[in-house]
Amino acid sequence: MAATSQLQERLAEARRVAVLTGAGVSAESGVPTFRGAGGLWRKYRAEDLATPEAFHRNPKLVWEWYDSRRQLIARCQPNAAHRAIALLEHRAPEFLLITQNVDGLHRLAGNVRLVELHGNLWRVHCLDDGQVTENLEVPLQAIPPRCGCGGLLRPDVVWFGEALPPEALQAASDFAESCDVFLVVGTSVVVQPAASLPTIARRRGAYVVEVNLEPTPLTSLAHESHHGKAAEILPRLLGIPSDASGNFEFRISNFEMPSSDSRPPTPGTPEKPCSP
Ligand code: BJW
């Protein structure tokens, strides 16, 4: 971790705060990352599972993979990094969480102002009638699942070679161009177009802070880069108090609330993460 940090001072002065997250933020909840040791792409080929061509070739195989990931993620809980980001949303006058994660854990932690650039594992999308619906069935009773209209359903996620949801990408780009602080947590910063957002923010004058286990292509460009586990580093960086045993106290009262805030309360102490 960098010896000193100006993040708290910058946040105190900031009007618009953006956070970009990747798989590393959920790693300590027990959700596997994609790249690096233990990453999904070490075990599976993205071309076989995460492209539209792979799905058309073998929807059953792709759905079996997604079903097994949904089963694992269904047992996972947000960790201290998710909770810290949820508290940050309550503190910032204007805030946007831009996540590449499809696991839904940020929402579970209490974030409301968020865009999911790569979709969500708990939604399905009918290839025939185009309807997008929530689907929480774990495990799936039929693989591949079908829509009421008889059409083939696919996970409502973004695969390689596919366009990101245009409204989500536009909102993320607009916020990156105009924010005062841009925090980047647990992403390898290699998958485009998400990987360009911190650079856009930096060029437009934002204070850019990265938290990651290891250096990334962003490290040399960021104002601060902190290396270690997000669930340990992020609450400390944000000044969230901890008790005598070192457990962070995730209470809204630990932050000054914007006066007009009417959002739901942030959930309390994190639950135990599941085993991967
Ligand atoms: C911790 C930690 C702890 C671990 N604490 N840290 C320009 C140049 C080159 C290529 C392209 C380009 N533009 C587009 C492309 C192609 C491609 C791309 O970027 N490829 C690169 C890999 C080279 N991009 C696309 O295809 C995108 N589409 C697109 O651009 O379309 C254009 C278009 C326009 C109009 C019409 C048609 C097309 C789509 C990208 C979709 C990505 N999809 C996936 C799968 C989602 C569904 C699913 O989950 O199954 O999204 S791939 C995967 O990577 C997933 C992630 O969201 C994404 C990013 O990964 P992330 O989150 O960064 O995870 P990791 O594993 O890479 O990194 C984890 C990090 O955490 C590491 O750094 C660890 O060190 C760290 N860490 N534990 C802190 N405890």
For each predicted feature, which ranges?
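Conserved catalytic core of sirtuin-type NAD+-dependent deacylases
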Residues: 1-248, 272-276
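Short, basic, low-complexity termini and linkers enriched in Ser/Thr/Gly/Pro
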Residues: 240, 245-269
